């Protein structure tokens, strides 16, 4: 007597293997894979965790707020959470720190972290100051954006001691 394979079972196994292969291919981020990736600075992270680091600011080491990837954060002196001045072309030089959840800090902060829903997206603010990265900072500890005048105001390094906007 010849035993034939259980066709419905074989079909389910083949379908399951195909689904797993497809899922693995979609999750791949290897070179040559399709899809686009956003810059870490401009991408939204779920529940951003701010950190502190040190940066050379005006020839002195200073404690600064940093993005989850360790880069110095800044604020624009004329920005408001409801109506940011840094929009459009500004965002390519000063990408906003965006979030998909509640921001928090990996270290104790005396101020308040909030999310401002504005034209830039759900942007993280510290003590009412919208936070940005500077595209000119190429390494952790850089603070090359400090004191730059652009987009109607002065760019300042965000520190844990940053006072409430007002």
Predicted regions: what they are:
Residues 2-14:
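Bacterial N-terminal signal peptides that target proteins for export
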Residues 21-25:
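C-terminal motif of bacterial Sec signal peptides marking the signal peptidase cleavage site
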Residues 26-38:
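Bacterial lipoprotein signal-peptidase II cleavage site
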Residues 35-58:
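N-terminal low-complexity, Pro/Thr/Ser-rich intrinsically disordered segments
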Residues 39, 83-114, 152-166:
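A low-complexity, Ser/Thr/Gly/Pro-enriched, surface-exposed linker/loop concept
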Residues 53-71, 116-129, 166:
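Short, low-complexity cationic-aromatic patches
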Residues 67-82, 126-140:
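Extracellular/lumenal glycan-associated surfaces
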Residues 108-163:
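Extracytosolic low-complexity repeat regions of secreted or lipid-anchored proteins
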């Amino acid at each position: 007597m010849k035993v034939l394979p259980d066709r419905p079972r074989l079909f389910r196994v083949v379908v399951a293997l195909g689904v797993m292969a497809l899922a693995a291919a979609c999750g791949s981020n290897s070179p040559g894979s399709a899809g686009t990736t956003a810059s870490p600075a401009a991408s939204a992270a779920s529940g951003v965790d701010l950190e502190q680091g040190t940066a050379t600011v005006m020839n002195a080491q200073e404690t600064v707020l940093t993005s989850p990837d360790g880069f110095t954060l800044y604020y624009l002196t004329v920005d408001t959470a409801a109506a940011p001045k840094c929009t459009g072309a500004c965002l390519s030089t000063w990408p906003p720190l965006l979030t998909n959840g509640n921001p928090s800090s990996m270290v104790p902060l005396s101020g308040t972290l909030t999310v401002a829903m504005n034209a830039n997206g759900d942007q993280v603010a510290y003590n009412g100051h919208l936070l940005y990265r500077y595209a000119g900072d190429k390494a952790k500890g850089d603070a090359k954006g400090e004191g730059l005048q652009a987009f109607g105001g002065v760019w300042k390094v965000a520190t844990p001691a940053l006072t409430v906007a007002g």
